[in-house]
Amino acid sequence: RKGQPRDLQPPGSYWEYNDVRVNLLSLCLLHTFKSPLPEVLKERIMGPIGASDTWEWMGYKNSFVEVDGRQMQSVPGGTHWGGGIHINTYDHARFGLLIHRDGMWNEQSILPEGWVRQLRAPSDIRPGYGFLWWLNTGGEEWPGTPENSYAAVGAGSNIIWIDPDNDLIVVARWMDQAAVAEFLAKVTQAV
């Protein structure tokens, strides 16, 4: 159905994976912080977790907006080919560890209390999806893995998979989407 027109539905009655809501969230965050989001990410998250200086978050050349008289690039929320975050595996894993630790790093709260709990909560209309994270609700997303596992999945199946039962963060890069469930089941069997 992607790219095909559909009738608008009442909020909470229809679910479709797309980048529209993420891009709107990015624009809202620009207006909230009044700073480019890559700067906010570096200052509030990547710096405190000790990420390298090699990551970058890129927008499109035609994605500038004015916020309080200042031109800022409205970073795409989704990972479109050519835009989004470019990050190494080490930094990916550190971010996963921050999420696994409920937003805490070195006994410092990096994310608002309760945020990670909310992102792991199944949505009513799509129980396998929380706040931008895929959930293994009922073991349906990745059979053979813990039902409380969850993952961030980006373009090219770049994955941060978190298994709270085994205190495990797995980062997989450029994996065939069809192979992800089997791969994660094998990881689970190995621990």
Region locations from a protein language model:
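Catalytic-site signature segments of enzymes, centered on catalytic residues
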Residues: 1-61
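Signature tryptophan residues that serve as conserved aromatic anchors
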Residues: 15, 105, 133-134
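Short, glycine-/Ser/Thr-/acidic-enriched flexible segments
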Residues: 140, 176-177
